[in-house]
Each structure stands twice: as C-alpha cells, then as structure tokens.
Amino acid sequence: MSRLVVVSNRIAPPDEHAASAGGLAVGILGALKAAGGLWFGWSGETGNEDQPLKKVKKGNITWASFNLSEQDLDEYYNQFSNAVLWPAFHYRLDLVQFQRPAWDGYLRVNALLADKLLPLLQDDDIIWIHDYHLLPFAHELRKRGVNNRIGFFLHIPFPTPEIFNALPTYDTLLEQLCDYDLLGFQTENDRLAFLDCLSNLTRVTTRSAKSHTAWGKAFRTEVYPIGIEPKEIAKQAAGPLPPKLAQLKAELKNVQNIFSVERLDYSKGLPERFLAYEALLEKYPQHHGKIRYTQIAPTSRGDVQAYQDIRHQLENEAGRINGKYGQLGWTPLYYLNQHFDRKLLMKIFRYSDVGLVTPLRDGMNLVAKEYVAAQDPANPGVLVLSQFAGAANELTSALIVNPYDRDEVAAALDRALTMSLAERISRHAEMLDVIVKNDINHWQECFISDLKQIVPRSAESQQRDKVATFPKLA
C-alpha cells in the first residue's frame, strides 16, 4: 500500500489535539492514519535553518519539520505568499505589493523544500501538496526526477484571468501548476477560472470534462469542497455554559444575538458588515434595545499596514454606531479584537439567534458550516451568508446575500430575526444534511481516491514534458 506524503506550509505539532488543530489538520491526520505516511512542513521557527530535519513518529505517521532563515521566511511567506498571492487571489489587486526579490525568494524556498523532501520519498509514495505557498512545488520535484503522483489542493479562491493575469509572474505560475497530476479546488467557479487563465496563455487539450493537457503535461482538475467535523462540533456546542457566559445569557434572555467571528482580514468584509448592521438599526427601529451584534475579530498579520487600517476603521465604526444608536442599558454593537477558545465559540454559536458570515471573497469559510453544526436542531439560529463564500454553493438554505449591498444584508438580518421556528428548523435541517454528508473525512477520502487512480508519470513522459510545448496560436 502506497504511503501518503502531505506537504503544507505549516504542520500541526504531533502533540496537538486534533480538536484544537483546526479543520485542515483533522482532515490531513485522518488521511495519514488511513494510509500511513509523512507530514512535511515548516516548524514555525526561524534560525538554525541548516540543522537536520526534526522528525517525530507516532504510530504510522512521521512529522518532519524544518526551520527557515529570516530572509527566506520574509521573502517567501510575508512578501510573496501574503503580500502578492493572498490579495490577488482574493481579488484585491490594489493591495498587491510585487517585488522581484520576493518572487525570487518564493521560488528559492520551494526549491529548498524540494531538496529537503527528496531523500524522504519512496517510489510509490502519493504526494499531496496544500495551498498557495507551494504553487511551484511539483515543478521543483519533477526537475529532480520525481515521477510520483502529486496532487494539489487550493484552499483559497482562484481568480479570473482579469485578476490573475495582472500578476507579473502569472505565466510561470500557470505552467508550474501543470506539473501536478491532480489540481483540486473549493468550487466549480475556481476550477473554471484556472482553466480560463490557462486557455488564455496556451493551448489546452481537454480529453474528457476534467482531464487536460497543456505544454505536453497531462493533469486533472476537480472540485473538493472542504468540510468540518459536525459531530465533534455539536459535542463541543452542547453541555453547560461556563459560569460567566451562563450569567451573560441570563442577562440577555430577552435580547436576540447576532454573532460573527472572523480573522481580522480585508477579505472578510468586516467594515461592510458594520455598515449593514447600521442600516438594520436605521431601517428597522423596532429592533432597538432588543438585539445585539457581537463581532469577534482577532488580529492576524498585525504588522501589515492593510490590517492595521482595518482594525482602526472597525474601532472607529463601532464607536460611531454605538454613539449614534446606543441607549442607557443597551449597547447595540460589541467589537472584540481578541482570541477566544474554539470550544467556547461553538457554545456561543449555539446560543446565537443569527450567524452573520459575509466575506467579500472566501475559498470556503468553515465558520459558516461550524455555525450550522453547532445549532440545537429543535431551536436553531439562522445563517446569513455571503454569495461570495464557497460555502454558499452548498448551504443554499442560508439567507444568501451580496455583502456589498448593505440594504440587502440589513433586510436579511431582519428576516432572520423574525423567522418562524418551523422555517428555521427546515432550513437548518437541509444545511446540516449537506454538512454531514460532505464532512472533512469525505473531503480527504475523495481527493486521495482520485489521486490514487492516476497512472504515475514515467521517466519517458517526464522527458517529453521538457521538450513538448504547444504555444497558443494567435
């Protein structure tokens, strides 16, 4: 039986409990336990980058981690992955800060990681690469003679050609991506956007609906919407509340709660969300004194100016809205720029009447799925969800909104707050069925199954790939 080798920018420490490690870690660990294998990634530490890989083995899984130099981390991770790819893939070209040294560092680190992984590989290993930090990784492995089956999953959106082709290195990235055997995306829109970008650059031959050839390289594309662990989340959400939260719930027994939790990121649409809530207060004054909107948004990448700007904007907007609409004994908006324990959040989800998830662009958004899974099926809350979140393709019984239309979001919030119990139960049941069916294990099992079905490349095909190119005709 072939081993599974997983490569991601960061790895979850082997002593970290799966429940607190996040969705990706749960899925990866499930796949690794089933097949046995290796999880390879950055340790999270800088310095001593020349020291040997740190290896830890537990059961049939080996964790192999490495350090990066300060320069490598800055250029590969901060300056290119997060200052070029992240904003571009989330349709924010205005925030892209392309610098040629950062691009060189991005390629250099991917090559370095390929060098580090190469001695660990076995001939029949199946290799699964994750996310935008590692777009060129298969290309580097192929250059080193690796013919194994290599799959790639993109956790964030893939932009349309108008966006992607604005990147100075878009052509190189596209050709490098074709060195993967299987390219997985969150949604059909993402998959088609990738193929559109490719078709604009070179001739793409499609043998079947999702099997393609470009530059003489054969690959497949497929959609794998990532899921969650609904049973684990329901378990975390149930049970007694911590004393302080129980006291707060008792104090707010006549107040309906709108709740939201996101990383502080410009892709999440937080300023637009605040303005939509203000529109609710303005257009539907009957809710005054009877609702409360709590936004939890812990800082991420706090040293980046764009993130600092959002934080200051939210602080100002929260103060302005509370000053305008607040009353003695009633604060309409609570904004908390801090981290909360995941298990506590699931309990808060359960006692929230409305879950507000309105990113401007998101690959999937697991918070939306977690909110649904955390609800009491007999008395569930209502999910208000952005049409630009990948989850909207599955959670069609949510109230789907355009996050740029504050009046539409305000109307959806009013509808959610006044929705009948029967409709709430019906909508929740439909969404929960989808979430249970497409859980995190289903996601990884489908991807691995499809990757296993691909015939490994031969040395001869590798040589053909190097010489056979088919430029797009004018």
UniProtKB/Swiss-Prot annotation:
Superkingdom of source: Bacteria
Activity regulation info: Activated by potassium and other monovalent cations at 0.25 M, but partially inhibited at greater concentrations. Inhibited by validoxylamine A 6'-O-phosphate.
Keyword Transferase among UniProt keywords: yes
Biological or metabolic pathway of the protein: Glycan biosynthesis; trehalose biosynthesis
EC class (word): transferase
PANTHER family membership: BCDNA.GH08860, TREHALOSE-6-PHOSPHATE SYNTHASE
Name under which the protein is recorded: Trehalose-6-phosphate synthase
Organism the protein comes from: Escherichia coli (strain K12)
Record gene name: otsA
